[in-house]
Amino acid sequence: MAKEKFVRTKPHVNVGTIGHIDHGKSTLTAAITKYLSLKGLAQYVPYDQIDKAPEEKARGITINITHVEYQTEKRHYAHIDCPGHADYIKNMITGAAQMDGAILVVAATDGPMPQTREHVLLARQVEVPYMIVFINKTDMVDDPELIDLVEMEVRDLLSQYGYPGDEVPVIRGSALKAVEAPNDPNHEAYKPIQELLDAMDNYIPEPQREVDKPFLMPIEDVFSITGRGTVVTGRIERGRIKPGDEVEIIGLSYEIRKTVVTSVEMFRKELDEGIAGDNVGCLLRGIDKDEVERGQVLAAPGSIKPHKRFKAQVYVLKKEEGGRHTPFTKGYKPQFYIRTADVTGEIVGLPEGVEMVMPGDHVEMEIELIYPVAIEKGQRFAVREGGRTVGAGVVTEVIE
């Protein structure tokens, strides 16, 4: 049986459910697929299937993630849901599954809880741009004023972390009631689900495609072709490149070299244009083989700068995950793998009151590399020591 072809007719958007444990994230995910399956726009994925999420590896870390897909009249959605709190943190930090918008699920019976706050903070730090709130379990609260109070608290919380708390769509409903409702899409219990989908279609803008962003390609390999010059190879991370385009070579020092790409090749054939996702070789004008190396990036002029010092949110692997067995303190010097660069760095700052970082923690830290590399906010990286991954991080602020 041939695999179904992915027909790209509708715009594609990545979303996910976030929020405190047992507030109904997976039930809501199941409810969405059930409702849309009745309209022929999804396959129903029951709760127990979502809850036993398969394992994935991202940057050397094992994460349990469920991916479901569904369509509305307007769009195609890929939706992620993680069963465990630690899985969310790992997913957000590694960027295993990135989100164009998140659905924050808050139980009306509890209101915002510690993990609600933690997920919102992380979403902000990893730049999940849009947030929609689903107040769940409203059938279990008799007094509507209590639900109003929960809504106020959630809007407040979002504002504290830089989301537009006053404008965020808030939908009230019961995910369980929708899952248990009869198979008639017009049934009352599905109304909040349709409201949520409308909010997603209208409030979360269509994301800018990677190919429309400024060109960037991490350099994986360098070789010289006699009589032609120096070729650098790698996978184009974003944007597009064609012969004649000016680029900058960035990283490993503060000096930025300008050059022109004179040819773009894929499988030894010349291309008119390379785009995001392509593995290509770029022939560089007037650059010797020893003037460029793995770990640098080729980028559109002015689009990214080399930096040594930055703040990052880092998840430190537990011993059971193959990480360190002992804590570390300020002054710890592991290797940082940033795109194709492998560079030693030092932990120069930890939050106030944090003396040591234990395996299993996630913590904001300040890092200083021994030489500058191309870095920007939202950049993911791995932390390694002695050939094994001991952590994963995301840049939250560039300092110098």
Swiss-Prot record:
G2: annotated segments: 60-64
Cell inner membrane is among the record's keywords: no
Pfam families: GTP_EFTU (PF00009), GTP_EFTU_D2 (PF03144), GTP_EFTU_D3 (PF03143)
Subcellular location: Cytoplasm
Region G4, residue ranges: 136-139
Domain tr-type G span(s) in chain numbering: 10-208
Protein's gene: tuf
Catalyzed chemical reaction(s): GTP + H2O = GDP + phosphate + H(+)
Keyword line: Cytoplasm, Elongation factor, GTP-binding, Hydrolase, Magnesium, Metal-binding, Nucleotide-binding, Protein biosynthesis
Spans annotated as G1: 19-26
Positions that bind GTP: 19-26, 81-85, 136-139
Binding site for Mg(2+): 26
Keyword field contains Cell membrane: no
Protein name: Elongation factor Tu
Region (G5): 174-176
Entry EC no(s): 3.6.5.3
One Gene Ontology CC term in the entry: cytosol
Quaternary structure and partners: Monomer.
Family: Belongs to the TRAFAC class translation factor GTPase superfamily. Classic translation factor GTPase family. EF-Tu/EF-1A subfamily.
Region spans: G3: 81-84
Top EC class, one word: hydrolase
Role this protein plays: GTP hydrolase that promotes the GTP-dependent binding of aminoacyl-tRNA to the A-site of ribosomes during protein biosynthesis.
Gene Ontology MF: a single term: GTP binding
Entry-linked PANTHER family: ELONGATION FACTOR TU, MITOCHONDRIAL, ELONGATION FACTOR TU-RELATED
